[in-house]
Amino acid sequence: IQPVKITNYTQIFRNTWAVSESTRATLTIAGDTNVAESRTDCAAFHAVDIEKALFFGQKSTGSRNGQPFRTMDGFQSIVSNLTYYPSSYAVANVTTAGSTTSYTQLEAALDPLFNQATDPKVGNERMLFVGGTARKVINAIGRLNGTYMMVDGQTSYGLQFQTFKISRGTFKVIEHPLFNSNSTWSKMAMALDLSTFSIAYLGDRKTRHDAFGAGNAGDNGYDAQGGTLTSELTCLIKNPPANGIIYNLTAGVAG
């Protein structure tokens, strides 16, 4: 076994919610109270910030307001970094698709992921996180490489593939809403070996909620209620060569 050292920074995530006491006291026609909705929205924004960094974060260090400021490498940066691969690898497991992609080309892009076995108890299976365009390409590849029949009286039609196989492994396709936020990410596919991935918190710095208002001690007469969610963590990929990325999935063809 050839050990490879992978380094990363921890990143602090903070999101704050607040509503005035007037807003708190205002009754809503439907749904949760204003306090509950604001708190829930804050939790959702906090989760999205963390998830975006886990996928697309880039490691950096600097300062803000005289204090140190760090960001972490996410899945994309780690898997794309050839220095995190054994010396036998000439290139990272990253492929940019052409204007069209066939099954043969898709298999060629994903096959190297199975040269590494992270956990012998886990079969050759990967999660494939994709955008909407990439999902349609993968679906088209399956549809154009097979046949299906429709019969009289049929009230629905079409094909929707959730899983596909290549010679050496299986991929479960998951369309991630975050990937649909722009056209570039929509054409991406990230193949993740779950046994290589984990979130590493700095000590006890798991998500913490600090509230103010609502009669909490030390509120100094705030005419509001609110709180702050704080987490400090990093993305941990133990075996980058077991993962992979495909860019620019544009159209599927037979072959």
PLM regions and their residue ranges:
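Core alpha/beta structural scaffold of self-assembling particle/tube/pore-forming proteins
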Residues: 1-255
